[in-house]
Amino acid sequence: NRKDDLMRWARKYQLPFRVPKAFPIKTSRALRGAIAMRSWNQEQAFIDAIFAAYWEQGDGSIGDYARLRQIAATLGVNPDEFEIAAESGPVRAELIDSTNKALQRGVFGVPSIGIENDIYWGKDRMEFVEDHLARL
């Protein structure tokens, strides 16, 4: 099953991993939150915190604003301002635009890696990614 497969990959690469309490989850709020955090130059820190909460700590609540607001606060961002920004029209439009661009490019799942005109999908395709990068 999928959870067993995730555990195998984590063991192989000696990564901290806990099966999330909720899996899979709706990620649109977290994605909009990441876009919103650009306003505070905290986008990457926010993404890292979400990733750690979900995959390392098994926290299945990262799709909920209560949890996302806590993460924003730990990064020094006012939680109310964060949620307002994440729900704003421009942030929603940017996520829709980014999603449409990914679909037009041929992305159909996560993880997907685009190099030049090629799309590589799945964690088990990293050798192909390495081969492609070596040819550049």
Where are these regions (language model features)?
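Structural alpha/beta surface segment adjacent to cysteine/selenocysteine redox centers
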Residues: N1-Q57
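C-terminal cap of thioredoxin/glutaredoxin-like
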Residues: A49-L136
